[in-house]
């Protein structure tokens, strides 16, 4: 089965089997957000367990 190229661009698989993703709300309307909020949004997040299987199929 082919992988979805859109999903490959957005998600990374870790060695432990988790999937990393970027946070939303980072660029649009950013000036009014606090520096602390923008700093935390820069860090990668992991995909929740409920969506892990669906996204794993795509990559």
From Swiss-Prot:
One GO BP on record is: translation
**RNA-binding in keyword set:** no
Q: Does the keyword Ribonucleoprotein apply?
A: yes
SS bond list: none
Disordered: region residues: 17-47
Family the entry assigns: Belongs to the bacterial ribosomal protein bL35 family.
Q: What is this protein called?
A: Large ribosomal subunit protein bL35
The root-end lineage is: Bacteria, Bacillati, Mycoplasmatota, Mycoplasmoidales, Mycoplasmoidaceae
Gene behind the chain: rpmI
